[in-house]
């Protein structure tokens, strides 16, 4: 990666008023550190969901928090509605009671789980369908209890977490 070329291009875009912030997608912390020598990175768009929580465990999201980099989550619903895995079966069982408790649906619980993370992750819902956008907005109204957050995470992991 030629950081000088990228930095020059971004500086030019900022000077022309074309962009206000600069973000990257799927960058590992080492890539961000390299590029950050020349330019402020404001966002990193990564795959993150209950189906793929590894960025929360491998230090990626911690790195974002330490360096004041916003996290955007693509594929925030993960494979929950696509694959009938043991993990998803355990989560569905938990959701039976949580859907009732929060008067919502599984899609919104998946988004609320992401939104509850203290790093203020922004899910990218990836739809242009009005009904789905309105439904996703309802997830912002859910104040997921921390115990429920951990019960969802533990269901995905298949074990208690400390």
Task: Pin down the residues of each PLM region.
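Beta/alpha (TIM)-barrel catalytic core signal, keyed to glycine-rich beta->alpha loops juxtaposed to Asp/Glu
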Residues: 1-162
């Amino acid at each position: 990666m030629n950081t000088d070329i990228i930095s020059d291009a971004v500086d030019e875009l900022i000077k022309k008023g074309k962009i206000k912030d600069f973000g990257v997608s799927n960058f590992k912390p080492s890539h961000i550190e390299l590029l950050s020598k020349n330019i402020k990175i404001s966002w990193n768009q990564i795959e993150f969901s209950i189906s793929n929580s590894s960025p929360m465990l491998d230090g990626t999201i911690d790195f974002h928090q330490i360096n004041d980099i916003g996290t955007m989550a693509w594929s925030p619903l993960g494979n929950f509605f696509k694959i009938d895995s043991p993990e998803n079966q355990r989560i569905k069982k938990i959701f039976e009671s949580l859907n009732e408790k929060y008067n919502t649906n599984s899609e919104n619980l998946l988004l609320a789980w992401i939104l509850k993370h203290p790093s203020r992750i922004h899910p990218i819902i990836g739809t242009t369908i009005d009904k789905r956008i309105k439904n996703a907005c309802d997830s912002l109204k859910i104040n997921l209890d921390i115990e429920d957050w951990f019960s969802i995470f533990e269901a995905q992991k298949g074990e208690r977490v400390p």
